[in-house]
Amino acid sequence: MNLSFFDQFSSPYLMGMPLILPSLLLPTLLFPTPGRRWISNRLSTLQLWVINLITKQLMTPLNKTGHKWALLLTSLILLLLSINLMGLLPYTFTPTTQLSMNMALAFPLWLATLLIGLRNQPSASLAHLLPEGTPTPLIPILIMIETTSLLIRPLALGVRLTANLTAGHLLIQLISTATIALLPTMPSISTLTALILLLLTILEVAVAMIQAYVFVLLLSLYLQENI
């Protein structure tokens, strides 16, 4: 019974082939495509408004050089947002609960920001490893600490997204299981549990959106340090 709670985090298979790739591609098919008319419909207008709002928030702390990343970061946040929200639907698989996928997104992008800084301004990038005004005896220790904190950034990005979504899905499944189990014997308690489940679902919708935003926002801040 305990192991069955984690079955939702296993990639489903069809004829021996994992279905994680279609689950990653499906959210991109849900976005409306722009029409050929001069005036867009309401759905396309809402989509463009959301994309412009997200892009503005991400690009505000960056200079003009960092604006080259606008398409990549906006596409990434829309992909994560779609996958996280679709994962809250019943009988669906959430790819972002897999640490391997989140690390595959976090590590290359973090490494790209680091290499850009080392190529364009190596002195300023290396200066981040030593805070200004550090006493001489503490310099080796602080360099080791700052280097460690720099290297664990992609791990923190991936683990944060995985842990938050996994915990939310487990809580929803545990409370929903308790609601069904209490319904025949204690209907009043089951009703209260169902209300808690509704509030938790609303909270998880907010968590899904916030975690997608935090993931990309931290990448933009890492980029800001290196351009």
From Swiss-Prot:
Spans traversing the lipid bilayer: 12-32, 69-89, 98-118, 139-159, 170-190, 196-216
InterPro entries tied to this protein: ATP_synth_F0_asu, ATP_synth_F0_asu_AS, ATP_synth_F0_asu_bact/mt, F0_ATP_A_sf
A GO CC term assigned to this protein in UniProt: mitochondrial inner membrane
Organism: Coturnix japonica
Assembly and binders: Component of the ATP synthase complex composed at least of ATP5F1A/subunit alpha, ATP5F1B/subunit beta, ATP5MC1/subunit c (homooctomer), MT-ATP6/subunit a, MT-ATP8/subunit 8, ATP5ME/subunit e, ATP5MF/subunit f, ATP5MG/subunit g, ATP5MK/subunit k, ATP5MJ/subunit j, ATP5F1C/subunit gamma, ATP5F1D/subunit delta, ATP5F1E/subunit epsilon, ATP5PF/subunit F6, ATP5PB/subunit b, ATP5PD/subunit d, ATP5PO/subunit OSCP.
Protein family (similarity comment): Belongs to the ATPase A chain family.
Catalytic activity: H(+)(in) = H(+)(out)
Name of the protein: ATP synthase F(0) complex subunit a
Entry function: Subunit a, of the mitochondrial membrane ATP synthase complex (F(1)F(0) ATP synthase or Complex V) that produces ATP from ADP in the presence of a proton gradient across the membrane which is generated by electron transport complexes of the respiratory chain. ATP synthase complex consist of a soluble F(1) head domain - the catalytic core - and a membrane F(1) domain - the membrane proton channel. These two domains are linked by a central stalk rotating inside the F(1) region and a stationary peripheral stalk.
Primary site of residence: mitochondrion
Membrane topology designation: Multi-pass membrane protein
Keyword DNA repair attached: no
